Amino acid sequence: MTLQCTKSAGHWRVVVWDEEGFQGRRHEFTAECPSVLDLGFETVRSLKVLSGAWVGFEHAGFQGQQYVLERGDYPGWDAWGGNTAYPAERLTSFRPVACANHRDSRLTIFEQENFLGRKGELSDDYPSLQAMGWDGTEVGSFHVQSGAWVCSQFPGYRGFQYVLESDHHSGDYKHFREWGSHAHTFQVQSVRRIQQ
């Protein structure tokens, strides 16, 4: 069973700038933004998350690489993408992560796509799935019972990030194609809960 999250208006705030170091033009968001281009920005190069958790995307329309943005300052691309294998130096669209709940998050991982094969139940952060006993470097599918999670391609939360939420796809992610437009492999080796 997937638990539905409660969305509250005004719970999210992020301020973005078009230059690194919190310089240049700025804009504040309290809701999703499919394209900063519509606001006259070419890109976002620094930001401050004031409340809530957000996911930033490399391209407009919530496409491309995903970056989890939790409360704090991001003075440049290396602050949000320094752990990834292929960092994007800009962000072009944003949306809040509605179901982030660090204390009550549950995720089931499956060995194969379509919820087949061996499975594991998670309710904590795992910097290495192999260290917790998961065989191999791949996860075929996910079912998010509650909360929001970020899965990473490599141990230590490095590599491509995939945001999984209980209120998207009814919490069911049957194949890597549902993890995001940039997903091209089943390789997932670390998983953590997203914090509000």
Swiss-Prot record:
It comes from Rattus norvegicus. Keywords: Acetylation, Eye lens protein, Repeat. This is Beta-crystallin A4. Has a two-domain beta-structure, folded into four very similar Greek key motifs. Residues 99-104 are annotated as: Connecting peptide. The modification N-acetylthreonine is found at residue 2. One of its GO terms (molecular function) is identical protein binding. PROSITE patterns: CRYSTALLIN_BETA_GAMMA (PS50915). Belongs to the beta/gamma-crystallin family. PANTHER family: BETA-CRYSTALLIN A4 (PTHR11818:SF19), BETA/GAMMA CRYSTALLIN (PTHR11818). Residues 12-51, 52-98, 105-146, 147-195 form the Beta/gamma crystallin 'Greek key' domain. It comes from the Eukaryota. Residues 2-11 are annotated as: N-terminal arm. Homo/heterodimer, or complexes of higher-order. The structure of beta-crystallin oligomers seems to be stabilized through interactions between the N-terminal arms. InterPro entries: Beta/Gamma-Crystallin, Beta/gamma_crystallin, G_crystallin-like. Crystallins are the dominant structural components of the vertebrate eye lens. GO terms for biological process: camera-type eye development; lens development in camera-type eye; visual perception.
